[in-house]
C-alpha cells in the first residue's frame, strides 16, 4: 500500500507488453483469410472484411496502450476520466464515420473501410489524450509514470504476462464463442442470422451494465486486499454479486415484457422480427447467468486468480456453449426436438454454458476468499 512509484514502473512495463502483444495482433489481423473462410462468405464480402481488418490492425497498438491507461485509472478510482474520454470519442466518431463512409468535402465515399479508418483515428486520439492527462494531471504526478524511461524488465513482464495472459485468453474464449456462434448460425440462412444479430446486439448493450459493475467491484476488492482488509474484500464481493444479480434479473424481466417495443427500435422486416422474438426468452435468462459469471470472474482477478477461470471458460463456453449449440442447432443426433433446433439451440446451449461457468466461478470465489482470509488475517492497529 502507498508504494506509488511502483505503479509508474508497472505502467511502463505494461506498455512494453502491450506493444509486443499488439504486434502479434496486427500480424493476425493483417492475415485474416484463414479465419474468414470458416464463414463461407461470398468472395465480395470476404474481400471487404479482409480490407476492413487490415486497416483496423493499425489502431491496435493505440488500443492496447489505452487499455493499460484504463487499468491505471480504474485501479486509482478515476474511471470517470476514461468515461468522459470515451464519450468525447463517440461524439467525434459519429460524424467522422459518416464523412469517411459516405464521402464529402473532397473525400470519396469509402464504405466499410472508411469506418475502419475512423476507428483507427479515434483509437490514437484516445491514447494521446489519456497519455496527456496522465502527464499533465497533478493527481498522477505521485505515480511518476513519465519520470524516467524503463527498458523491458523480463521478470516484471513475465509477472504481468502470467496474470494478464489468462485474462486475455478468457476474453478471447468469450468473444470467439459468440463469434463462432454467429458463423454457425449463418449456415442456417440469412433469416435466422438476422434475428440472431438483433438479439446479440441487444445482449451486448445490456452486458455493459454487469461489466461496469464488475470492473468497479474488482477495483474495490483489489484495494481492500492491498490495504490488508481481506474481510472487507469478501464483503464487497458478496454484496456486488447480490446487487448485480438482482439488477440483471430485473433487466431480464424488462427485456421479456417489452420485447416487441425493443424489437421495433431495430425496425426489422416482419419475418426477421418473428425470428428474433423467439430468442428473447433465452436472452432474458442469459443476462442473469452472464452477470453472475462476469462478476465472479472480476472478483477473482482482484484476488489475482485468473488461470483456473480461463479453463472454466474454455470448457464451459467452447465445450458446452459451442459444442452443445452445434449438436442442438444442427440436430446432429437426429432426435433433437424441433423447438430447440436452429438458432434457438445455440442460444440454449450458450445460456446453459454461462450458468455452468457462473456456478463454478462462484464456488472458486468462495474457496479463494476463505483461504485468503485464513492466510492473511486482518491487520490490527
Model-found features: residue ranges?
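Hydrophobic/aromatic residues within transmembrane alpha-helices of membrane transport systems
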Residues: 1, 7, 35, 49, ...
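Small-residue-rich hydrophobic transmembrane alpha-helices
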Residues: 1-26, 30, 63-82, 195-259, ...
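Residue-level recognition of pore/gate-forming positions within transmembrane alpha-helices
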Residues: 13, 22, 26, 89-91, ...
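Hydrophobic transmembrane helix module of multi-pass membrane transport proteins
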Residues: 18-108, 113-121, 128, 132, ...
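Short membrane-interface helical motifs at transmembrane helix boundaries
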Residues: 24-54, 250-273, 277, 330-333
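Transmembrane helix-bundle signature of multi-pass secondary active exporters and lipid flippases
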Residues: 56-63, 158-223, 227, 244-252, ...
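Membrane-interface helix-loop junctions in multi-pass transport and translocation proteins
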Residues: 80, 91-128, 274, 307, ...
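Interhelical loop/hinge segments that connect adjacent transmembrane helices in multipass membrane
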Residues: 112, 116-119, 131-174, 370-381
